[in-house]
Curated annotation (Swiss-Prot):
HAMAP family: CoA_diS_reduct (MF_01608)
Cofactor(s) this protein requires: FAD
Family listed: Belongs to the class-III pyridine nucleotide-disulfide oxidoreductase family.
UniProt name for this protein: Coenzyme A disulfide reductase
Enzyme class, UniProt record, top EC level: oxidoreductase
Record keywords, A-Z: FAD, Flavoprotein, NADP, Oxidoreductase, Redox-active center
Organism for this UniProt entry: Staphylococcus aureus (strain MSSA476)
Record: active site: 43 (nucleophile), 43 (redox-active)
EC number: 1.8.1.14
Amino acid sequence: MPKIVVVGAVAGGATCASQIRRLDKESDIIIFEKDRDMSFANCALPYVIGEVVEDRKYALAYTPEKFYDRKQITVKTYHEVIAINDERQTVTVLNRKTNEQFEESYDKLILSPGASANSLGFESDITFTLRNLEDTDAIDQFIKANQVDKVLVVGAGYVSLEVLENLYERGLHPTLIHRSDKINKLMDADMNQPILDELDKREIPYRLNEEIDAINGNEITFKSGKVEHYDMIIEGVGTHPNSKFIESSNIKLDRKGFIPVNDKFETNVPNIYAIGDIATSHYRHVDLPASVPLAWGAHRAASIVAEQIAGNDTIEFKGFLGNNIVKFFDYTFASVGVKPNELKQFDYKMVEVTQGAHANYYPGNSPLHLRVYYDTSNRQILRAAAVGKEGADKRIDVLSMAMMNQLTVDELTEFEVAYAPPYSHPKDLINMIGYKAK
């Protein structure tokens, strides 16, 4: 009976194991997870902190006991894989509760260890990062136990923005700092102005080009020379792949510690796959490498690897489009395609339109800004971005499907919109992009 070992029990690992069991009732499947919880919703964590998700239990899909009962898959939490011997096809596992080590053999090995939050490295009792449910519980408990009021949020990526909004909605007083003037880097820089407007509207302090210089208790000294007091600091300064344990194996890592994979999510070593935040692949619509550490990619990779292991060796990954979205107070920011800093590799043109998200005479209308970049050589769409209070999500999802099917910007005129005054226009913003590009 084949033995399948999975490293990591969150989006990629747990999903892959579950899909394998759906296709294969016989194999022995075991998952090692170094942390306390398995199969939790990472994307829910800021909303648990903000008490938008009223009970943390809704963010936890399975316990190991429930997972085994439903799927006959063994999950061992607090068990960290610390080494791989790919020649003998074994992994070395550390039981983090007992500090004991043991070896586990495998026929197939699936690596989905995820990534860890970067830290600024200050020794302080008031600094936190947010990456898992344990972090969420620690933040929530600290807020309650210490009557937290003023919170410093460091960083201006998606997670930091979501955390800041949820702290504010919880009734706390957050302040945002970021080390540069480039916030929310997945979005075009000039389309981020509503983020600052939303902060100003609520009188939430923020400072760009600012960093922490020192922390002494609750006293924070900044690079600008300012000295302020905060009850809590939440750091959102990026992540790094959990690949240290892989370095002693023959598995190839790139210079940043990620694992390059082929279209079957195979590594360079036979019988070893990599999925989720640890893996790098390529874009679907252009010939460029892509690392997209988001939920859709982990789930898609999990399904493909499960099919491969179950015997369907014809299924392959066609690449990422990098579709992403974030809510920040009243606004939605969404984009798809290559990142803004990758556009310079193409000869491109940009076309954009700003108009109401639905018919102007229908109540509740607000501006929606839609922008599309296309390759001048073949007129195929490279990137699209949308910002507004309404309708950004559906326009970007439609454009994602257009890019998936290699439509040209001109063909957007043929998009048949589901039109009624509360929802759109007879000529939708997507149509207008196509007309303006001609």
